[in-house]
């Protein structure tokens, strides 16, 4: 899992509709959390069944992502940056694991990375290889650009009976909150079996270079389109 960020990623995969682009960030978040940001890309693909080549990549990754490597994972710069950010927003990273640490636990618990579908397998590969936090949405349910902001007083959230607590950091489009940052996705906006276009979002925190986000999005897109 050596991280090689000095090289630019290869050309865009076919069917990836645009190069990763930065999303918007609410001014109050930019002031409170320097380095916080979101990058997105959209591709003409949905979940579907993973081809054998993608399953083989998961098997190879399982062999490399084990033992001592998984144990020392949190000490690496990118996972550590997310752990620091978790503490800043009131999450204990020893109780609420960062995405890559959750994958490490799943790998050790299951004995391997289990193949689930094209999207989940692609996200597993990208998150495990680079360490960047990724989220996926049904592109047809996204209105405009994605960004990060604080929830408003009494703001509704699909799938939740009560409003979001005010001041919750959310991933949002230009109309509504789509997900709690590092938390639950609103009902009906995540990737589903019928999804044909997927928007991938990479979350940047202080200490995570932009090139790492671009690499993670490229890896996930390439795997989905393989």
Give the ranges of each region predicted by the language model.
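Charge-biased, low-complexity intrinsically disordered regions
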Residues: 2-226
């Amino acid at each position: 899992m050596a991280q090689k960020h000095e090289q630019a990623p290869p050309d865009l995969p076919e069917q990836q509709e645009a190069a990763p682009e930065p999303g918007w960030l609410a001014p109050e978040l930019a002031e409170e959390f320097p380095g916080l940001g979101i990058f997105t890309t959209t591709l003409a693909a949905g979940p579907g069944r993973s081809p054998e080549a993608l399953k083989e990549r998961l098997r190879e990754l399982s062999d490399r992502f084990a033992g001592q490597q998984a144990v020392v994972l949190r000490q690496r710069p990118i996972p550590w940056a997310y752990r620091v950010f978790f503490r800043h927003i009131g999450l204990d990273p020893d109780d609420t694991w960062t995405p890559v640490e959750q994958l490490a636990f799943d790998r050790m618990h299951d004995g391997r990375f289990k193949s689930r579908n094209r999207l989940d397998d692609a996200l597993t590969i990208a998150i495990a290889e680079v360490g960047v936090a990724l989220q996926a949405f049904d592109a047809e349910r996204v209105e405009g650009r994605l960004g990060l902001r604080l929830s408003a007083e009494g703001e509704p959230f699909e799938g939740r009976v009560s409003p979001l607590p005010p001041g919750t950091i959310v991933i949002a489009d230009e109309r509504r909150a789509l997900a709690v940052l590092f938390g639950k996705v609103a009902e009906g906006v995540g990737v589903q079996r019928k999804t044909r276009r997927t928007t991938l979002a990479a979350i940047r925190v202080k200490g995570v270079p932009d090139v790492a986000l671009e690499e993670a999005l490229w890896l996930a897109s390439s795997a989905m389109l393989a």
